[in-house]
């Protein structure tokens, strides 16, 4: 497909009530915006990944999945043509879907490994295992270098409480850069800095976001 869309379709008649269609309602989530759009020039290389996400908690429709959520301001979904096109050219090939014939991708939780470097705060690895939160005092700037110790393909799940008007920036990289813009040994961090794709979160000040 060269344009985005969404289709939910059950395999049996039991799921028909949940199938996507004209009865669905939609809204544009204003909490999300692209960031890290200049990584090609920053890293002086060709980038083959999309931008990062800038997420503003005070614009997110919290509770949208709850039964009593007020969706009066949402619009009716626009139903497109058939999603299956066997052949065609031009506009008849904008939204093209076909059933997958291969297994689903692996999905499991991975927790980050260790804290390699810290600035502005003293911490331990217990918060990485989920045993207790990392508490950052107000009007404080901290920096943590977290090492997974192996390369992986994953997406970030972060839980935030309070911290209204704070900024949380997560930068991802396979290795650090030295003063000559070289990566070298991935295990070495002394005198090196991180450059890479990043996401930014702006908490709304509430609990367990």
Residue ranges and their predicted role:
Residues 1-209:
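Extracellular/oxidizing-compartment recognition motifs
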């Amino acid at each position: 497909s060269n344009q985005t869309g969404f289709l939910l379709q059950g395999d049996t008649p039991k799921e028909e009530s949940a199938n996507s269609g004209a009865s669905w309602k939609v809204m544009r989530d204003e909490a999300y915006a692209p960031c890290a759009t200049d990584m090609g020039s920053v890293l002086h290389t060709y980038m083959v990944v999309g931008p990062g996400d800038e997420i503003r908690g005070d614009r997110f429709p919290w509770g949208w999945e709850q039964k009593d959520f007020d969706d009066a301001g949402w619009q009716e979904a626009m139903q497109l043509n058939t999603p299956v096109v066997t052949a065609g050219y031009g506009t008849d090939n904008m939204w093209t879907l076909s059933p997958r014939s291969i297994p689903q991708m692996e999905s499991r939780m991975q927790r980050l490994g260790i804290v390699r470097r810290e600035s502005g705060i003293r911490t331990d690895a217990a918060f990485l295992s989920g045993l207790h939160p990392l508490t950052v005092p107000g009007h404080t700037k901290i920096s943590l270098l977290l090492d997974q110790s192996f390369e992986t393909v994953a997406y970030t799940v972060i839980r935030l409480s309070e911290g209204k008007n704070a900024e949380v920036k997560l930068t991802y990289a396979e290795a650090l850069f030295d003063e000559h813009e070289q990566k070298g040994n991935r295990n070495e961090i002394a005198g090196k800095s991180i450059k890479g794709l990043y996401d930014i979160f702006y908490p709304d000040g509430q609990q367990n976001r």
